[in-house]
Amino acid sequence: MTLSPYLKEVAKRRTFAIISHPDAGKTTITEKVLLFGQAIQTAGTVKGRGSNQHAKSDWMEMEKQRGISITTSVMQFPYHDCLVNLLDTPGHEDFSEDTYRTLTAVDCCLMVIDAAKGVEDRTRKLMEVTRLRDTPILTFMNKLDRDIRDPMELLDEVENELKIGCAPITWPIGCGKLFKGVYHLYKDETYLYQSGKGHTIQEVRIVKGLNNPDLDAAVGEDLAQQLRDELELVKGGSNEFDKELFLAGEITPVFFGTALGNFGVDHMLNGLVEWAPAPMPRQTDTRTVEASEDKFTGFVFKIQANMDPKHRDRVAFMRVVSGKYEKGMKLRQVRTAKDVVISDALTFMAGDRSHVEEAYPGDILGLHNHGTIQIGDTFTQGEMMKFTGIPNFAPELFRRIRLKDPLKQKQLLKGLVQLSEEGAVQVFRPISNNDLIVGAVGVLQFDVVVARLKSEYNVEAVYESVNVATARWVECADAKKFEEFKRKNESQLALDGGDNLAYIATSMVNLRLAQERYPDVQFHQTREH
């Protein structure tokens, strides 16, 4: 069966994001992936602040100063016969809900683990989000050029802590100064590592066969024997790769390598284009939309301000779900039921914008937004439906925000509501007083809000600590019981930026007690946009 040109384009697309704990090497991997995709000629390895070769994917002013990626940018590059869309996710302590929401716009994730440290806190949280949609996961064990933990231990830890089976595809030979390369379990080939070649794509020497005497000569008899012994254990004690289980999010293929040394990244990329799914169907509130449909649909998962310091603009990022975007197309914004002509959509290579003539399912478009587009907005060619599964997450950090000039209360509220629509932060207005409480998932969100209030709304604000540990959105099917709950808990209720009722708890114990006391009230940790 020959596919139509449209379906061929759809089948070529792979859209993925990288999830990791800060400093596990995510930005370096992003660089190397782009190098293999020929999107950049030499990888601008991320160094300290003095280095002038800033990594291509870190670009807002604050990021340049801090050497971190705050904003989720999008990069498209060709690899083999595929077109890959890589959505970069903020990695540092300073990550935000954007990171979570970006994971709702991809069909697959690459989990990067620092092999010296194993599974870390942020990785756990991000994996929980991928679980909401059983997203397929590939795993890259990074930093093999350093001393690492025992590889079998690492696999056990991933399986036990993240509840996903591991299927090793490559296996390391030594580590640190003794790192010699990796063996590919399914190709029966050993790839030999040379250090100092990290900035370019290196020619790799390959030794075929596990019992080939050349292997002993290349890595030394001891390491060669150790490899054979370890592989006996691996083959006996780990999962075989099974594509169906991978696509169901039940097992993850595991690759070993060093992103800094640019070694092993291509094995992972080959796995990605071979196994990761082409654009997947999506649920709406009325039906499932298939990528093969010819009518255009898409949803907004993130809004970013100030991508162009010369213009104070915002860009809404839209994931194309079905149909082909063409320049000058008329689309319906379902929430407002208005038709808009989109003539200047953008694609990105972090920071370099280019106007796009056409886009297909799996691609990400940037739409200019002057405050009319919100997160979760659905665009169609007229059909009235809304994509689901683009959540707000309950914040984990809270501050009270106060004005230096009390006369600017109106501007402050306007600014905060707009920033919350954009997903930069969440705002809660307690019912029992006039406080304004700002909730975030990462600390840096607070700095960003104050900086943007000042530059965009001319409002000077400061934070104070507030006795709030967590928030949950509340609802109840029984109106009478809900009224009683609201009456008795008025001092702990607040409205968010979209006027949804939330319970703000002073501690986790306080939240648990409230949940036990009011079993008919539902306390939600996420809320649909």
Curated annotation (Swiss-Prot):
It is found in: Cytoplasm. SUPFAM superfamilies: EF-G C-terminal domain-like, P-loop containing nucleoside triphosphate hydrolases, Translation proteins. GTP binds at residues 20-27, 88-92, 142-145. Residues 11-280 form the tr-type G domain. One of its GO terms (cellular component) is cytosol. Keywords: Cytoplasm, GTP-binding, Nucleotide-binding, Protein biosynthesis. Its main location: cytoplasm. Pfam families: EF-G_D2, GTP_EFTU, RF3_C. One of its GO terms (molecular function) is GTPase activity. One of its GO terms (biological process) is regulation of translational termination. It comes from the Bacteria. PROSITE patterns: G_TR_1 (PS00301), G_TR_2 (PS51722). Increases the formation of ribosomal termination complexes and stimulates activities of RF-1 and RF-2. It binds guanine nucleotides and has strong preference for UGA stop codons. It may interact directly with the ribosome. The stimulation of RF-1 and RF-2 is significantly reduced by GTP and GDP, but not by GMP. Belongs to the TRAFAC class translation factor GTPase superfamily. Classic translation factor GTPase family. PrfC subfamily. This is Peptide chain release factor 3. It comes from Shigella flexneri serotype 5b (strain 8401).
